[in-house]
Amino acid sequence: MQMCEQLGQINTTIMTNSIDNAVRLMLNKLPEVELLGGKIDKGNRYTYSMETLSQLDNITFDAAFIGTSKIQPDGVMVVDSYDAAIAKKVVERSRKVILIAQKYKFVTNNSSPYKSANLKDIDVLITDVPLEEKYRKYFKPDIKIKYVKEDETK
């Protein structure tokens, strides 16, 4: 959601399946927003469908911003299989993949069984504090890491 505030004046098109992100992005004239369709997961506030996955096969993204509920040595993890499937497809179809993850996502014990991306596919990591070397090694050597404190996005 904080990233949406940063994107509020950029002349681009943002495609999302997140209801909350779409609503936040609509507060400004720019950017143009496309909400992917399908069923609504009311608990997690996103949309999903098989048609969405097919639609994504025909799109190439300049950049994909993805989130996570947990980071493990083998990947970016989320709590729902539909969310994972959409994120995987977007990662496949993107020229650049940007992961947004606070440091606690590396140490959480939350159950997040579905992999949405391989860590080697991540080009940029946006996080809140410098990573310990053991976590930095999860990613490819040339990853760009941007540290953003929460209040820097306001």
Language-model segments: which ranges?
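Conserved SAM-binding loop
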Residues: 14-15, 79
